[in-house]
């Protein structure tokens, strides 16, 4: 940092350690930042890995899941960003192109509002996104079950990370 003219020489900084191989220091930092939230709360960092932390008054429990590649567009037929993927999927659902199970309907009426998304995601892309969402949900449900909390007792769910910020 010392050679970068945009960073003050008097700046103090701290790079926290990772919690584990799949729970990085970004999750530590986000949890510390959010610690003033009313507990219990969930912090979900959707990045390369899906990192999920349940923060209670006297305990933090964490897990990770393989959600990042689909939301980052790495496993999809078109290499597009996660936020564009989610936006496209949303438009396809709203337009009746995808049914409640995630099946892309043959002969769906694309109409004006959804014509721009026609063919943008294929069936395998939709399935990859469903698997990623399911991995995050399973992580959340596991943390809540292990903590013996009711989902209704969770005060907040903070979505963070680069992808979370784009949502």
Q: What kind of feature is each model-predicted range?
A:
Residues 27-34, 130-152:
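Phosphate/ATP-binding catalytic cores across multiple sugar-kinase/actin-like superfamilies
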Residues 86-132:
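Gly/charged contiguous loops adjacent to phosphate- or pyrophosphate-bearing nucleotide/cofactor binding elements
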Residues 154-167:
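Glycine-rich phosphate-binding loops at beta-strand->alpha-helix junctions
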Residues 118, 143, 165-167:
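Generic long, charged, amphipathic alpha-helical segments
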Residues 19-23, 80-81, 120-135:
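Catalytic cores of large soluble enzymes that bind and process phosphate-bearing ligands
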Residues 1-6, 13-18, 22, 29-84:
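Glycine-rich phosphate-binding loop of actin/hexokinase-like ATP-binding domains
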Residues 36-39, 58, 90-98, 141-149:
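Generic secondary-structure signature for well-ordered alpha-helical cores
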